[in-house]
A protein has these predicted regions:
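Conserved P-loop NTPase architecture
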Residues: 1-154, 373-454, 458-461
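Conserved nucleotide-binding/hydrolysis micro-motifs of P-loop NTPases
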Residues: 13-17, 53-55, 67, 185, ...
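Mature, matrix/stroma-exposed regions of nuclear-encoded mitochondrial and chloroplast proteins
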Residues: 65, 113, 215-226, 278-280, ...
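Conserved G1/Walker A P-loop phosphate-binding module
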Residues: 101-241, 448, 456
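Canonical P-loop GTPase G-domain recognition
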Residues: 131, 283-285, 292-375
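Conserved C-terminal guanine-recognition region of P-loop GTPase G domains, centered on the G4
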Residues: 200, 227, 231-319
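Intrinsically disordered, low-complexity domain-flanking/linker segments in eukaryotic proteins
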Residues: 216-225, 258-265, 272, 306, ...
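Short, conserved glycine- and acidic-residue-centered signature motifs
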Residues: 230-233, 339, 423
Length: 461
């Protein structure tokens, strides 16, 4: 793999035998050719330096070694066979060619006659630069989607006290991760659990129930006073929801009061928070819990869904689910009850939302293969940040061209005063960002870039 000669020892026996062999190897070496333990990532680094692997594939290999779920594994394997490095290099070569045209005019304009003025040449080059900027913009957007697969999707449960948020979390993760009680305000802080949902790594957070001082607890007839600890829990719950990628809004079927009929409870605090989340463009799924009490409402499930949709019309009906954590926990799958509590359909809805979040954007740009957008999901955070920096330099170049064009409309004599040196510098800086992506070419301090990548590997890789 490294491109160097390798000697492997296949040792039989326990740890003591391995330790003895390693000790013996240390004694057999000479001072001129010492033998030492490999540093983290050293074998992979040597493979890179010997041109056996490029830097984007090195990062994909690191993702493969740390993959926990199936979707993470697929993303990392895709990265090891994708053409990200060659694509970055082709973009860099395009910028080098564009920069060369500008610098030719800078260096030889006094000795040679050029058909185009500086502003005209820059305007001609800007067509390619604008196309590249658009490609990089969508590439970077897809990289953000890929990071959701790589780092995990943040999911929060939001609702009033006692609607069954903790029971829902326990049912999703398959164990008692959160305390379940009939007492209001049992959950005071965010309880976060990592779980594999359909191959997607998800960080699921249970939060404190939302209510105001003037609101009644769902299981009590009299008003409960909120203490300072619970107030802080409610504040953290709202903050957690705003930071999450997906929010599950939990309502429940409850009796309005002692002896009164059951109906869906949608408290003011919860609805206000939901509208704030919608304004922040958050992905919301609604779970209407305790549907085992549906018969006591005199309503059909479709009527309950319609009532929620009327209160929150921005949420489509296919993201509103009627469930029963009680039935899901107490019943087993069978031919008679294939989906107890409609819980499987609810989880499928969550997974479909995850797919929508992580499917690549395909802008259908002329002259591009659709496969590049799927591959762009594999771009790491380091690559995305460099792409964003590259875009900043490209936008600077385009802004200079636009300003010169606007000035030329006002005064024709200004056209020849376009500063090609500054424009060429913007293209050089953009090309250097692309070079740092692969660790090749004029990448500035490449050693610093490589150090960041390889130090994440364990010893022996």
């Amino acid at each position: 793999m490294t491109g160097e000669d390798v000697l492997e020892f296949h040792i039989h026996g326990g740890p003591a035998v391995v330790k003895a062999v390693l000790t013996a190897i240390g004694k057999c070496t000479s001072s001129s050719e010492p033998v030492r333990y490999a540093e983290p990532g050293e074998f992979t680094r040597r493979a890179f330096l010997n041109n056996r692997i490029d830097l984007t594939k090195v990062e994909a290999l690191g993702d493969t070694l740390s993959a926990v779920t199936e979707e993470q594994r697929r993303l990392s394997v895709q990265g090891t066979v994708s053409g990200l490095a060659s694509r970055y290099e082709s973009w860099r070569q395009l910028l080098l060619a564009a920069r060369g045209e500008l610098e030719a005019l800078i260096d030889f304009s006094e000795d040679q006659h050029f058909d185009e003025s500086p502003a005209e040449l820059a305007s001609s080059v800007s067509i390619q630069v604008r196309h590249l900027e658009k490609l990089i913009r969508y590439h970077s957007s897809n990289a953000v989607r890929g990071e959701l697969l790589r780092n995990g999707i943040s999911l929060s449960l939001i609702g009033s006290p006692n609607v069954g948020k903790s029971s829902l979390l326990n049912q999703i993760v398959g164990r008692n991760a959160a305390i379940v009680s009939q007492e209001a305000g049992t959950t005071r802080d965010v309880v976060e659990v990592g779980v594999d949902l359909g191959g997607f790594f998800c960080r699921l957070g249970d939060t404190a129930g939302l209510r105001g001082n003037s609101e009644k607890d769902l299981t009590q007839a009299m008003t409960s006073v909120i203490g300072e600890v619970e107030k802080e829990g409610i504040k953290r719950a709202k903050e957690k929801a705003l930071q999450s990628d997906v929010v599950i809004l939990v309502f429940s079927i409850e009796a309005a009061g002692k002896g009164q009929e059951h109906r869906i409870q949608m408290e003011k605090q919860v609805l206000e928070t939901a509208r704030q989340l919608l304004a922040a463009k958050k992905n919301i799924i609604v779970a209407i819990n305790k549907m085992d009490k549906l018969a006591q409402t005199g309503m059909a499930a479709a009527d309950i869904v319609a009532e929620v949709h009327t209160a929150l019309p921005e949420i489509s009906k296919d993201r509103i689910f009627c469930i029963s954590c009680k039935d899901a926990a107490s019943s087993k799958f069978s031919a008679d009850i294939p989906d107890p509590g409609a819980f499987r359909a609810f989880v499928d809805g969550i997974i479909n939302t995850f797919k929508d979040l992580t499917n690549p954007l395909d802008p259908n740009i002329e002259g591009t293969e659709p496969s590049i957008w799927q591959e762009s999901l594999g771009a790491t955070e380091r690559q995305r940040l460099l792409l964003d920096e590259c875009r900043t330099h490209l936008q600077s170049f385009l802004q200079q061209v636009e300003q010169a064009r606007d000035q030329a409309r006002i005064d024709d004599d200004v056209e020849d005063e376009f500063d090609l040196v500054v424009a060429a510098e913007s293209l050089r800086a953009a090309a250097d960002c692309l070079a740092k992506l692969t660790g090749r070419g004029e990448a500035g301090d490449v050693e610093e870039v490589l150090g960041v990548v390889f130090e994440k590997f364990c010893v022996g890789k």
